[in-house]
Amino acid sequence: MSMFCYQCQETAMGTGCTLKGVCGKTSEVANLQDLLLFVVRGIAVYNEHLRREGHPSEEADKFIYDALFITITNANFDKAAIIRKIKEGLQLKNELASKVTIANAPDECLWDGNEDEFEEKARTVGVLRTPDEDIRSLKELVHYGLKGMAAYVEHAHNLGYQSPEIFAFMQSALAELTRNDITMEELVQLTLATGKHGVSAMAQLDAANTNSYGNPEISEVNLGVRNNPGILISGHDLKDLEELLEQTEGTGIDIYTHSEMLPAHYYPQLKKYKHLAGNYGNAWWKQKEEFESFNGPILFTSNCIVPPRANASYKDRIYITGACGLEGAHYIPERKDGKPKDFSALIAHAKQCQPPTAIESGTLIGGFAHAQVVALADKVVEAVKSGAIRKFFVMAGCDGRMKSREYYTEFAEKLPKDTVILTAGCAKYRYNKLALGDINGIPRVLDAGQCNDSYSLAVIALKLKEVFGLDDVNKLPIVYNIAWYEQKAVIVLLALLALGVKNIHLGPTLPAFLSPNVKNVLIEQFGIGGISTADEDIMKFLS
């Protein structure tokens, strides 16, 4: 076994990747990511002690969420970049260690090493370092929730929003994960606390996005192309998009969104740019084919990278920024001294490229985040009371490569016409281009936005609970049938559990990192379930 990773839904054989990641990461990269996470836990222990003394390190705060983000599925495949981050972390850890003394410090605090020692150490600090499978399962569940939370924290930070309370929790949780004597009950409570702070992190990002760009509104998004050279922007970071739009305005270059960047078109302060031309392509996993025909440069702002084939025509057109890493790609450095990122090289490259080749046409409707749906509340409530809407189906989450995900297309197609789908995240691409119609002018697919906008769906549910005078969110006519893929979906799930939502169905498979006993806890306490066939599930959910 040269590595072990089971953090994503597509993990090999449904048990774990041991030779190379299904995502495309090498065993070396996987092991180095384990070592980076090990270093992060040590930094967290030191910074938690410094926080108790009243002077935590802001540099440590940022390093921790940035490093966690790097280890998310499909974010960083660059061995050299991860080694640099480990070295940076060890230096930071040593600086913190000089300021505080810790009795009985864990190995995460004590270990130091040179690059030639990284590989050997990495093999001892991965997932399998914890022998008890239930403790291991819960530790990894918390780890993955923290990774998802870190992504949301970083995007909010880029817009000038941060929370000392969230930093404090993340670091105290990481410190707890260094304990060898931690109990299953303690970890269950830590898991629930992770969900609670996940709600706070999503609320913070929602505030950052809406205060910066306005509340999402019902918007029509073009799926075709124009005749100008284009830049395709993928990932989730709206600040990167804003700066790119500003720097390309008046240059004759059009900007197209890809996958999870689609909801940018719903924000008033982003869609005002006339050269934000449309959305190109589908969910992240189809990029190897779709990027070939785009013809212009592609900018990755966060996880959603699929390493290109060796003979891919677009390899030299890939640009990355933020936590992203891909060997051979052009890197856009971070902001310095409050100045925007410099996209001039990317823009110059785009000017030398042909316009994108059309791969589809038509439009999409979206923008149904919580403020927009609340504005339509009277119409929605009347439709429910009259029986025009029988049930809502929350089908948020992620898309992926597996053929079993065709279930979600079939499920959406077969739902009765008196049902409405509430969605967020790239799971929407399984059904957002189907002609599912509307109910009294309300589209049957209401897209709230990116995966973090699952927060909007929770706010909508809580608002409906209030409007209908119910004492329990689970009494609403809402079914949760969520598709998961990576760690941001994990924090969304934990956040929903923290909000009291029960009977969530998760697919296409349950996570490999859930041991049988942990799975039973989730089933017994929260009603977590899997999926079967579209026909069987629709019959069950509507009964």
UniProtKB/Swiss-Prot annotation:
Chain positions found as Cysteine persulfide: 398
InterPro entries: HCP/CODH (IPR004137), Hydroxylam_reduct (IPR010048), Prismane-like_a/b-sand (IPR016099), Prismane-like_sf (IPR011254), Prismane_a-bundle (IPR016100)
GO cellular component: cytoplasm
Organism: Bacteroides thetaiotaomicron (strain ATCC 29148 / DSM 2079 / JCM 5827 / CCUG 10774 / NCTC 10582 / VPI-5482 / E50)
HAMAP family: Hydroxylam_reduct (MF_00069)
Manner of cofactor binding, per the entry note: Binds 1 [4Fe-4S] cluster. Binds 1 hybrid [4Fe-2O-2S] cluster.
The protein's required cofactors: [4Fe-4S] cluster; hybrid [4Fe-2O-2S] cluster
Compartments where found: Cytoplasm
Membrane-crossing residue ranges in chain numbering: none
Catalysed reactions, semicolon-separated: A + NH4(+) + H2O = hydroxylamine + AH2 + H(+)
Protein name: Hydroxylamine reductase
EC number assigned by the record: 1.7.99.1
Family per record: Belongs to the HCP family.
Record keyword Metal-binding present: yes
